[in-house]
Amino acid sequence: MIRKMSKNVVVIGTQWGDEGKGKIVDWLAESVQGVVRFQGGHNAGHTLWINGKKTILRLIPSGIMHDGVTCFIGNGVVLSPEALLREIEELEAAGLDVRSRLQVSEICTLILPYHVAVDKAREARKGEGKIGTTGRGIGPAYEDKVARRALRVQDLFNPALFDEKLAEVLDYHNFVLTQYLGAEPVSANEVRDQAMALAPALAPMVRDVSSNLFALQQEGKNLLFEGAQGALLDVDHGTYPFVTSSNCVAGAASAGAGVGPQALQYVLGITKAYTTRVGSGPFPTELVDEIGTRLATIGKEFGSVTGRPRRCGWFDGAALKRSVRLNGISGLCITKLDVLDGLETIQLGVGYRVNGEFRDVLPYGAHAVAQAQAVLEELPGWTESTVGITEYSKLPVNARRYLERVAEVCGVPIDLVSTGPDRNETIVLRHPFKG
């Protein structure tokens, strides 16, 4: 059999999440037959604006908005059945066909009520020292996976095995809850009854996702792998311990979807024209003045899932350089360029001073990053609006110069520029699937 040629693209956030991946995945989905989520859980919200209507997706890939596109939730995702089914119902109420176009890996780790209880109790106990989790049980579920005590989607359809595994894992978590965290225990019967009640609705969507993705590749179908969070929140390469609990880098698409690394041919890095961060953790280019407030206000910088305000700062090119290296980024997509409209001057981070020495790439670990002082370069701003522009040549001259300097500092070309929330408000310099 001669294998047909397909092209597969990985979309990755290059900062601390919230870069605008959802819109770009939705836009790129016109060129694919499958969209795959490969890590994270329902802690990450992807916001889409379609013809002026706002849609927030937490678990379901953004390709669901396109007829004829099959969406996959890969094994690297930690899955709350309750959250998934609620999201499906919301989309169906809006008139979308979801269940016939969604496949869920049978080996996804389940998020169950005791994970949420542990997550919330830990954050409450830490007080001011908390990481800033969403309290949705993501971290504790990944802990169970690594400790080899997790319940998985396939266990929902073997009640005897489910009960056996639940008794073991709940014995551990209830000990932690009551003896260490000072919280109430979780009832095994309640966990079981809830899970078994949800299982029949989930069953028709449960598949061997890895095999089905392989089959699509053999047929020459294009695939899009949709990352959640951002590379600087990666559990290994991010500002540890102020990170998420999964690997957010492009390489995680292979393990988290069950495809070979040779299937990942192009990596698109999504980055804002400035920088934001939610929750705790070091942030070298953060602005705590009126400009930071202005960026947050104009950029509507509030979390799509939690509603938490985002911290804002100048674009950090040295942090992006780390992301470019980690992900093997082929090209960048710059989002929210319009938020910088009207600024007289714009600062761009090109490196750091660490113990008196210049560093041109983000150090590893939160302690080292906290010691780093951003080295900023000043560029002229622009007064003209960039909103809705779809041709690069029509951008203000200084906006083009800013983008060119960003590409130079990061060492990778800019292939796309998003000039508004709607999928059509996009400048294409090189199309990831067609270029």
Swiss-Prot record:
Positions contributing to Mg(2+) binding: 18, 45
EC number, as in UniProt: 6.3.4.4
Active-site residue numbers: 18, 46
Main location: cytoplasm
Cofactor info, note text: Binds 1 Mg(2+) ion per subunit.
UniProt pathway: Purine metabolism; AMP biosynthesis via de novo pathway; AMP from IMP: step 1/2
UniProt-listed CDD domains: AdSS
InterPro entries, A to Z: Adenylosuccin_syn_GTP-bd (IPR018220), Adenylosuccin_syn_Lys_AS (IPR033128), Adenylosuccinate_synth_dom1 (IPR042109), Adenylosuccinate_synth_dom2 (IPR042110), Adenylosuccinate_synth_dom3 (IPR042111), Adenylosuccinate_synthetase (IPR001114), P-loop_NTPase (IPR027417)
Superkingdom of this protein's organism: Bacteria
Binding site for substrate: 304-310
Enzyme class, broadest EC rank: ligase
Residues bound to IMP: 18-21, 43-46, 134, 148, 229, 244, 308
Location relative to the cell: Cytoplasm
Gene Ontology CC: cytoplasm
PROSITE patterns recorded: ADENYLOSUCCIN_SYN_1, ADENYLOSUCCIN_SYN_2
Keyword Metal-binding set for record: yes
Cofactor: Mg(2+)
UniProt-annotated binding residues for GTP: 17-23, 45-47, 310, 336-338, 418-420
Quaternary structure and interacting proteins, as annotated: Homodimer.
Function: Plays an important role in the de novo pathway of purine nucleotide biosynthesis. Catalyzes the first committed step in the biosynthesis of AMP from IMP.
Similarity comment text for this entry: Belongs to the adenylosuccinate synthetase family.
NCBIfam families: PRK01117.1 (NF002223), purA (TIGR00184)
Protein's name according to its UniProt entry: Adenylosuccinate synthetase
Organism name: Bordetella bronchiseptica (strain ATCC BAA-588 / NCTC 13252 / RB50)
